[in-house]
Each structure stands twice: as C-alpha cells, then as structure tokens.
C-alpha cells in the first residue's frame, strides 16, 4: 500500500491531470483535496478530449473511487455538467463521492467575484471569476453553505438567509447590481442537492476506511505551489492550499498517512493571470512555446504567459512540499529549439540569490540568471524509454534533477496516455534514486 500526493510545482497548469490519470491506474481511491472550478485538467483518452474541473481524473477507471474532499469548494451546476458529460461518453460515475462538508459556491459568490475584480482596475489579481475566493471567504467567516445543506429544504433556507441578505446589500449598495431572490436560489439549489444526494458521503471516514483496508490512495491537488494562499506569490494566489500539507487538511488525514509526494513541473514555466514571473519570455520563443504547448487555460481560455524553466521556484517547491520525486511534462514542446535556458539563481538589487523571495515586490525586481544548454532539435514524441531520448534531452533532464536535488520518476512527451516514460511507478515502485 502507498498513499501519494500529487502537487503542482509551479504556477499551476503543469499537467497534473495527465499524471494523476496515469497514477490512478494503480490507485484504489483518488481524492481531490482543495480548490474548485477555478482549476481544470485535460485528459486525452482514445482521441477523446475530456476537460474536468472538479471530478478527479481517476473517474475514468471503473474500479477507482473518486472523492471530492472537504477542502474543496463545489459549484454544483458545473459539477452536474461534468457528470452528464462523463455519462454521455459512456463513463461509469458510480464511484464518485462528494464530502458532505464541502462548501458550495453560490450565485452571489460568482457575481461578487467578477464585480470585485472589475473594481480593482489596474490592481486586479487575475481571478477566474468563478466565485472561489468569496466562497472560501464565507467558509472562513463561518457563513458558508455546505453540500449537506442542499439536502434539506428547511436547513438550506435557515443557513442561507443571513449571507444572502449581506450579499444583496453589497450587490445593491456597493456595485449597483440587482439583488438575488431567496426563492429562486432555494428552488435551484435544492434540485442540485437532490441530483447529487446519492454521491454524498462522510469523506474523512471513507478515506480512513480505505486506509485501514490497505488501499492505495492518491491525493490530487489543484493549481500549484506558487499559487498557495500562504506560501505563494501573494496576493496573486488562489484562496486555498495546493501544497502537499493541504492534502492533510482538505482530506482530513494526518501527515503520517502520506508515504510519498510527487511534484509535477513543465519542462519550461507558465503562468496565467497577473503577478511577477522572473523568467517570462517575449517575442518568437514565447509564441513558439505557447503554440506548441497549446498554452490556453482549461478554465478561462486565457493565453498563458510562457518562460524558461525556473530552478529557483523548483527548489522552493521541493522544500515546501517535501517532494520525493518529480514528473516532468511537455518535454516535447522544446524539441525544435537549438538552445534552452534554465534559471539557476536571481539577481535582486545587485545581489545573487538562490532562494525564492515570497514577497511579490521583491520578486518583481528579480532578474533571472541563466544556464544555457544545447537543444536536441528532433522529435521526442515517440520515445517510450529513457534510452530512446536524444542525448541532449537526457542532459537537460539530468540538469533539472541535479538543480532541484530530486529524482525524476516520469517524463511526459505529449497529451496522450502512451506518450509517457515511466521510470518508476511512485505508487508501487521502491523508494529509490531515479534519474539524477
């Protein structure tokens, strides 16, 4: 038995969906532990492109249970659309479970999210506008609606009256937006509750029962390390904790239950939305990475900002997550480049530093110090084992592993499942040094 956490080691969009899908073959239970519909992952199965925001990738495997944990925030409208999409594609969703204590994104959360972002003007933080921040804010203020509340008419009416009155006051008086009607929300969300009721469980008890029965549990994070509310580039962050420690809180397990943490990182770096990005590229190479990597957000459709691999944030991710190994994705995107650069340190006000400054004002001033490596200028898309890779591609991977001081377990070379080199299965393989 092995319990593994999969986290993003950059600013999200690292390809966690594919890696989680790959590892789900060996997992009995997959748990999504934080975030909401602001995250998205794309999975390609038999030439079908499936885009999911809430449901774990493991849903594609018939014998794998998939839990949406207590640390998530659930938009039931979008969740039901995902369920319907999976059913239409012939996928069995009987293994889907939703924590009764997950908080619910309400219509006023989405409206307020968009209104507050518009009100920030030039100081916008790049929110997806999906209501995630306001939902987590209500959770912290103990004013939120939970999944269990959607299952009872009187309960929902009782818990929604005060927050709705407060939100309508904000909508009318601050933003000049028409207030929402209690009756309309009750009717809509009670219907959602009825449709979801058969999937609702005590998430923590379910996970601990699986652990007691020696099941393999995979904890799936959303977003990435640098978007963590406490350890990311605040305020340009999400409203939850994507780092590995968030798995314990969001799933309701102790740290001793976790056997291994695997970080997912692109062979280059991307960021969507606002905030400092030291290795960001401009011009033709940026366009090439964006086009070859199809760098457009699954959730927003926004074009992602692209840059060279940043070893400073990589080492930071290793530290705050306690990474045991790494999955490097989209190596094939670099195939046509004759030269590739990797950031090995920053210049901050004339001083060379090799640590990540979590103060966004300092990070804005950081200038990357690069190491240049030779490209391989041939396709890696059909490589299925390390020995198939061009020598310069191997050199590049070894350099990343040495820089981050963590072994590489998986290399992804395209969107399809089979475009992957698995050096070691992080669930079933022995815990040992791999590609260094």
Swiss-Prot record:
GO terms for biological process: 'de novo' AMP biosynthetic process; IMP metabolic process. The active site is at 13 (proton acceptor), 41 (proton donor). HAMAP family: Adenylosucc_synth (MF_00011). CDD domains: AdSS. Binds 1 Mg(2+) ion per subunit. It is found in: Cytoplasm. IMP binds at residues 13-16, 38-41, 128, 142, 223, 238, 302. It comes from Prochlorococcus marinus (strain MIT 9215). GO terms for molecular function: adenylosuccinate synthase activity; GTP binding; magnesium ion binding. Plays an important role in the de novo pathway of purine nucleotide biosynthesis. Catalyzes the first committed step in the biosynthesis of AMP from IMP. Substrate binds at residues 298-304. It catalyses: IMP + L-aspartate + GTP = N(6)-(1,2-dicarboxyethyl)-AMP + GDP + phosphate + 2 H(+). InterPro entries: Adenylosuccin_syn_GTP-bd, Adenylosuccin_syn_Lys_AS, Adenylosuccinate_synth_dom1, Adenylosuccinate_synth_dom2, Adenylosuccinate_synth_dom3, Adenylosuccinate_synthetase, P-loop_NTPase. NCBIfam families: PRK01117.1, purA. Pathway: Purine metabolism; AMP biosynthesis via de novo pathway; AMP from IMP: step 1/2. GO terms for cellular component: cytoplasm. SUPFAM superfamilies: P-loop containing nucleoside triphosphate hydrolases. Homodimer. Belongs to the adenylosuccinate synthetase family. It holds the Pfam family Adenylsucc_synt. It is an enzyme of class 6 (ligase). This is Adenylosuccinate synthetase.
């Amino acid at each position: 038995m092995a319990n593994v956490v999969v986290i993003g080691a950059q600013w999200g969009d690292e390809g966690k969906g594919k890696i989680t899908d790959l590892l789900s073959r060996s997992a009995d239970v997959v748990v999504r532990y934080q975030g909401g519909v602001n995250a998205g992952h794309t999975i390609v199965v038999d030439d079908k492109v499936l885009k999911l925001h809430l449901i774990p990738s493991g849903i594609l495997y018939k014998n794998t249970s998939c839990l949406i944990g207590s640390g998530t925030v659930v938009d039931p409208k979008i969740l039901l659309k995902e369920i319907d999409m999976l059913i239409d594609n012939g996928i069995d969703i009987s293994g889907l479970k939703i924590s009764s204590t997950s908080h619910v994104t309400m219509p006023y959360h989405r409206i307020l999210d968009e209104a507050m972002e518009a009100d920030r003007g030039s100081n916008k933080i790049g929110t997806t506008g999906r209501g995630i921040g306001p939902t987590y804010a209500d959770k912290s203020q103990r004013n939120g609606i939970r999944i269990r509340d959607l299952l009872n008419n009187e309960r929902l009416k009782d818990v929604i009256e005060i927050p709705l009155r407060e939100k309508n006051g904000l909508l009318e008086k601050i933003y000049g937006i028409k207030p929402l009607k209690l009756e309309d929300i009750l009717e809509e969300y009670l219907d959602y509750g009825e449709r979801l009721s058969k999937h609702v469980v005590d998430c923590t008890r379910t996970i601990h029962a699986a652990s007691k029965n020696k099941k393999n549990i995979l904890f799936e994070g959303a977003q990435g390390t640098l978007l963590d509310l406490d350890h990311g580039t605040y305020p340009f962050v999400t409203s939850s904790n994507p780092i590995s420690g968030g798995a314990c809180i969001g799933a309701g397990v102790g740290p001793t239950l976790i056997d291994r943490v695997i970080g997912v990182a692109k062979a280059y770096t991307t960021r969507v939305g606002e905030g400092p990005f030291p290795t960001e590229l401009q011009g033709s190479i940026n366009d090439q990475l964006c086009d070859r990597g199809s760098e457009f957000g699954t959730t927003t459709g926004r074009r992602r900002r692209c840059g060279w691999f940043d070893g400073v944030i990589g080492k930071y991710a290793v530290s705050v997550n306690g990474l045991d190994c790494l999955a490097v994705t989209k190596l094939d995107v670099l195939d046509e480049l004759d030269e590739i650069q990797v950031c090995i340190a920053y210049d901050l006000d004339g001083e060379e530093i090799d640590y990540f400054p979590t103060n966004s004002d300092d990070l804005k001033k950081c200038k990357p110090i690069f190491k240049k490596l030779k490209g391989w200028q041939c396709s890696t898309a059909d490589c299925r084992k390390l020995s198939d890779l061009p020598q310069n591609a191997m050199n590049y991977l070894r350099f990343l592993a040495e820089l981050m001081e963590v072994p590489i377990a998986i290399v992804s070379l395209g969107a399809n499942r089979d475009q992957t080199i698995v050096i070691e299965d992080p669930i079933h393989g022995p815990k040992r040094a791999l590609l260094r």
